[in-house]
Amino acid sequence: MSQIDKMAKIKKLREISDAPFVDCKKALENSDYDIDLAINWLNKNGKSKALKKSDRIAAEGLVLAKKDANSVLVFELNSETDFVAKNQNFINLQQKIGELLLANDFVNLEDALLIQDEAGRSISELMILATATIGEKITLRRVFKTKYSLEQSVEVYTHSNGQIAVITILKGGNLEIAKNISMHVAALNPQYILKVEVPNEKLQEIQLEVEKKAFAEVKNFEKKPENVRVGILKGMIDKQLSEFVLELQPLATDSAVTVEKYLAQNSATLEKVVRFEVGEGIQKQNVDFSAEVNQQIQEFQKK
């Protein structure tokens, strides 16, 4: 390899890793001028700034739901900015990680990070390499995977912007039914799947609120027969619960029926629904860009 080619490799490695010239040169010399091996060398020796970005908050990114003939999964891959989440390198990484997760068994997230690709690189290492290349912290935040049987109807839905993904597992039914439920859950994000999942305290609170409303707004409510009052209260309670309980909600694709009735009409029972949305529960970092620029200027002036 000519000296010019070596210098070009050093320049490229510096751009990727943001490591000093001397460290890039040494990394390449110890890696037979292979860029990927050199990045690994920098990471192992703590010279790459990719590892130093590990304390940053990654709250943007993409989610993806996938399935094969036996398993279904949904996972979230995070970056620091929405801009990077739209980067083709990030999208390619997400697809690769999805394939690895679907093809391999694991018991938890830590176990999943150890899964290796055909070149022997773990998912954790792939993310470190991508962090060095892209310039932002990249993390596999969470993943849900389960196996299913032929008696179950399983479908996945990932919204076109990659911000919401849902998997639905039904006993009976068919793929179209499962797909419609997945799309419904993606759009409405119900807090509970079944009415029985709602905590008793919350149910009691709603019941008291509805009873007061019934006496105040339903004409001659107190004079109606007991069975009529019970029916009115149940309808009012279910209507309020339908704001956050899946089975009581009007189906997004056909508001004439509730999800519960839609499933019953198609001989289907809801067994599992999992919905991931990018950044759920993450406290996003507030960045003062003006202060950041001023700090960089001050550091530059000290050199």
Swiss-Prot record:
GO terms for cellular component: cytoplasm. CDD domains: UBA_EF-Ts (cd14275). Keywords: Cytoplasm, Elongation factor, Protein biosynthesis. It is found in: Cytoplasm. NCBIfam families: tsf. Transmembrane segments: none annotated. The lineage of its organism: Bacteria, Bacillati, Mycoplasmatota, Mycoplasmoidales, Metamycoplasmataceae. GO terms for molecular function: translation elongation factor activity. Associates with the EF-Tu.GDP complex and induces the exchange of GDP to GTP. It remains bound to the aminoacyl-tRNA.EF-Tu.GTP complex up to the GTP hydrolysis stage on the ribosome. Residues 81-84 are annotated as: Involved in Mg(2+) ion dislocation from EF-Tu. Belongs to the EF-Ts family. This is Elongation factor Ts.
